[in-house]
Curated annotation (Swiss-Prot):
GO terms for biological process: formation of cytoplasmic translation initiation complex; regulation of translational initiation; translational initiation. Keywords: Acetylation, Cytoplasm, Initiation factor, Nucleus, Phosphoprotein, Protein biosynthesis. The modification Phosphothreonine is found at residue 28. It holds the Pfam family CSN8_PSD8_EIF3K. Residues 42-204 form the PCI domain. SUPFAM superfamilies: ARM repeat (SSF48371), Winged helix' DNA-binding domain (SSF46785). Belongs to the eIF-3 subunit K family. The gene is EIF3K. This is Eukaryotic translation initiation factor 3 subunit K. It comes from Homo sapiens.
Amino acid sequence: MAMFEQMRANVGKLLKGIDRYNPENLATLERYVETQAKENAYDLEANLAVLKLYQFNPAFFQTTVTAQILLKALTNLPHTDFTLCKCMIDQAHQEERPIRQILYLGDLLETCHFQAFWQALDENMDLLEGITGFEDSVRKFICHVVGITYQHIDRWLLAEMLGDLSDSQLKVWMSKYGWSADESGQIFICSQEESIKPKNIVEKIDFDSVSSIMASSQ
């Protein structure tokens, strides 16, 4: 992370003022994207600046760098980073490999087709070359979805949703989120009563307020 932090400070200066969209800075910004991928770090603002520079300077477009930006955006789900990045890529480039495959993976994740996502990823593992921590970042997102969706879930189903994890691997994620299993193979996620805390809203309306409203409506 030392290299990332050093580059982040330098890139932060580049992104200020009119130099933000100076094409001469593209090489530095592209190296910064590669550093994010290798060091499992993330800087959305810088990555959006790269995509904007590609919009302004189509001849400089780099498919590999754009693919890395999209994959890093997926690691930050459920935030809308992936959609923001996708909207800055023209349709012609969206049809190119590997961008087309990454957009498909993103669609599977955003629509919670997790088993299909892992199958598609397994068929395109070359996409993750140079990307550190991608799969575990996706698992964090899936656990987030599970946590707000389920009270109980079958052990085998959770293992599938997280990418066909072994029993020992599954236990690590269960421990991380405080989930427990019973003898029947069910995993207890949370109690609906504990996760939902209703608020009682009391609004006081005095007679003067009502009378003024009635008067104005006549």
